[in-house]
């Protein structure tokens, strides 16, 4: 019997295989087998991973998309990131904003945090609201 210590590197991928050479069954006095470990990562966050990039979806209102907004993201690093939209520049539905350096890290490389904005439109507008929008736009 031997206790095996598995080196899990930062940023390891789901389904990645770690091979520990000659740590498996003894075939004969000169030959030992390998131990293969398959990594199974269970995501319990609101982020989705794509390589080194992290993806996050943010729903905003029509008003926020037109007038600007800000919000805080609780990042997996434990840091809180504040996102401020650009005032005067409408945020389009489906826009993806990449923030370099806030993705996963592996072997000195860092991915991006990619925020996709989805706009929630009102179910109905009153005649008065429609007139105001027409007047403004």
Enumerate the predicted regions with their spans.
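Intrinsically disordered, low-complexity linker/assembly segments
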Residues: 1-137
